[in-house]
Amino acid sequence: MSKPSDHIKRPMNAFMVWSRGQRRKMAQENPKMHNSEISKRLGAEWKLLSEAEKRPYIDEAKRLRAQHMKEHPDYKYRPRRKPKNLLKKDRYVFPLPYLGETDPLKAAGLPVGATDSLLSSPEKARAFLPPTSAPYSLLDPSQFSSSAIQKMTEVPHTLATGTLPYASTLGYQNGAFGSLSCPSQHTHTHPSPTNPGYVVPCNCTAWSASSLQPPVAYILFPGMTKTGIDPYSSAHATAM
């Protein structure tokens, strides 16, 4: 960038007066050293100088400043403005997507201050939520009594065989996975294992003694079938 012909340089300060000769000397001693590294070293050396060593350069800087004011009485320092960075222009590097009018509170046309009152009152906020088709219901902790908790603990959380993709293909309907099936059509609810505040409907019967057996993994080798294999007797024979 070319400077205008009428550009007036600033008067040198004490450090610039001292570093003018030192920079030339250091550049001759280290021709491959970058100019920024030279400036860094000169600044460190200038800080190590005592006030008595800096005094001649301070006086020279004052003389140059007075001379500069005489030559340019209307001089005013105007720093060059750096071009604005394009990244700073966009404050959000990853802008949030616009969700449109899908927000129930926004679609209802509520004022800005009304959302605070809705957050403090869950009953009012629940009225703006869209209806859901999920068969789960939120239970209030005050509704749980000792008898209700005992009844819910007696009801197991079982999995249907259809939810296990490998159970039917391996043919273990009557094995460990078969004990997890729901043969009865009696509908009841039990607490969700992931969220105790929800109940999940299930067509399951109560736990039986056979369903408490842990699942056993079978490893079938060529020429072997799963019939006739007793895992407990095999494990006992191996341990012996």
From Swiss-Prot:
GO terms for molecular function: chromatin binding; DNA-binding transcription activator activity, RNA polymerase II-specific; RNA polymerase II cis-regulatory region sequence-specific DNA binding; sequence-specific DNA binding. The keyword Transcription regulation applies. The gene is SOX14. This is Transcription factor SOX-14. SUPFAM superfamilies: HMG-box. Disulfide bonds: none annotated. Its main location: nucleus. Highly expressed in developing brain and spinal cord.
